Every structure is written in structure tokens, then in C-alpha cells.
Amino acid sequence: MAPPGRPGRWQDGRVAGVARSMGVRHSTGTGPESGLVYEIPLRTRFRGVTVRQGVVWRGAAGWAEWSPFLDYGPDEAWIWLRAAMESADIGWPDPVRATVPVNCTIPAVDPEVAYAMAVGSGCTTAKVKVAEQGQELADDLNRVEAVRHALGPTGQVRVDANGAWDVDAARAAIRQLARFDLEYVEQPCAHVDELAELRRRLARDGIGVLIAADESIRRSNDPYRVAELRAADVVVLKVQPLGGVRACLQIAERIGLPVVVSSALETSVGIRAGLALAAALPQLPYACGLNTVPLLTDDLVEASLVATGGHLTVRDLVVDPLRLSSAAAPSDVVEAWRTRLREVHHAMAEMQSGEGRIV
């Protein structure tokens, strides 16, 4: 086995044979066109998502995953593809650490379920989803309280609103949530100027809860506005949405704020790229949101990237041909992803010609 984090050291066993048996030409150093389309249900609805789909393939440097959410158009999905191509064709920078601290992720579930998930994770940090459509602030308070009890006074609890609140609603919610000694609130409002205004109001109120920016980084034409407007205390970086490990390292260096590395709800194939980023960062002051494979009902590798004692080990992965076969998407889904890939290639061609968004 190669040292932790070295690119390209994935073993695939009988994967090529499995792919051929499904009528999909297996990728051996080519690209996503010959990859395998997977479909894996989630254990619990997560921000409206009940199933994850994506494409995996093996390039010259290793395995890669391309899995932009279905509501992402070509103008965003091509950036995810660029990240996957880095994993497949180039590999990742050398790591500076062998393990990465991680949080557990608690969906918008009942308090009893939230408590059990937090205890069962073995993590000392939890990220709790709040502001779920169809729920009330009281639901959030009960869920966060349950997680706080599960982790005890020394645990870290952060919440994520995914931009669902306006400034007034965020201020009101945080005033109540602050009693649970939050580590930070992730993306309470959708827009950068709203985050900046919220931070000013919280400071005037004497509420010392930190603000983290996620969507304002990964879905922005200018991620650095977060720092320029003093809109956040922490930034969340996700490898696929931001175009790869090296692109994220550049943002981390330039933005001048503490970084948390999180997943985009991928299989272990995609999580491994996030782990490579977390392992390569010079400083890692917070637990990372990379322990999300337990939210899936299945995976694509023999030994999934699941936390032990609140940490993930930076290690090589072995793709499981039986799991690949089990997760193979039906033909209509495969065709939809082929169409999507063609649209993304067109968008990438436009980017290379100087039109559109460049990250």
C-alpha cells in the first residue's frame, strides 16, 4: 500500500468484468464517458434528496466520482467534472497528516433519532441540519438540544441552515439556538451581503456565535467576497463544487479564513478527494464534514470511509465489484447522465473559449 494520500493506488479486482457484464465499457485511463452510473438511496431524506446518483471511473491516477446534484445545470456541473478529472488523471498533493477529525451529520430528524445518531457516530462534533422546509424553529431547538445532550458539554455542535433564513429570521433563530453553545452557524442566509448584515447585528446583540459560509463560496462567481465583506468567520470548502483539491487549496490560501472541508454527499470514491484536501491543508482547526457515507444505504468500496473515534484515516480504497454491480443505475438514468455529460462538455468548451464562469 502506498503512503496515505498518494494518488492512483486504487485496486479494482474484477471491476472491469462487472462493468462489461452490465453493458458499460469500463474506464481504464479514459474518462467519464466509459464510467459506471450509480444510484444509491439515502437512509433519510436529506435536504429534499432521497437518492444519490453519479458516475465513477478509473483514470491514470485513480478512481474518480462525478456526482453534481440533479438540479445543477451545466454551468455548475462542469466544475464538478473538472474536480473528478483531477482525481482520475492527476491525483492529489502529498498529505501533511495521516488522520482527519470529522463531525457526524444529523439530518432534520426527530430528537430521539438525532440523539441516537450522535451517540452512535463516535464523533465529538456534530453538524445538525436546521430550517428544514415544513418544520418550525421549535423542531430545530428540540433536535439541537438532543444532540447537545448526546455530546455533553465538551462536544462541539454546529448547525446548518443552507441559506433558508432571511436576516431577521436568522437573528431570531440564532438568539435561541445560542443557548446550546454553538461552534458556528453554517450559511444561515443565502446571500453574502445578508451574512455580513447578520454578523453586524449579532455583534450589536452581544451574541458571539460564529458564521460559516458554504453556498456563498461554492456557488459564487466570486468566493472571495465573503472575506472582503467580512461576511463569515469560517469558510466551508467542498472539492467537487469548487473544481478540485488544488483549486480549494488556492482558495484556502487566498481567502485568509479558517477552513472546514465538507463533502457533497458522495460515495467513498468522492469522499476520498475531500479527504485528500483535508490532509493537505497546512492548518485544520475544525473537524471536517466528511463523515457522510453513513447517510447512504450502500457504497462502492470494500471498506467505506466511515469515522472511527471521530477521525477518518487517510488511506487507499479498494473498489468492490459486487457493490458496483448492486448500485448500477437503470438504463433511463444512465441515458440521462450521458445526456448531462454531453451538455457539460459543451459548457466546458465555452469556458475554454473565454465565455461564462471561471473558478
Q: What does each model-found stretch correspond to?
A:
Residues 62, 257-261, 284-286:
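A short pocket-lining beta-strand/turn micro-motif at the edge of beta-sheets
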Residues 133-276, 298-300, 305:
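Catalytic core of soluble alpha/beta enzymes
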Residues 40, 105, 214, 262, ...:
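Conserved beta-strand termini and adjacent loop/short-helix elements that scaffold enzyme active sites
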Residues 283-294:
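Short helix/strand-capping turn motifs
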Residues 5-179, 205, 301-359:
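N-terminal capping/lid subdomain adjacent to the active-site entrance of alpha/beta enzymes
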Residues 276-283:
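Oxidoreductase and adenylate-handling cofactor-binding alpha/beta cores
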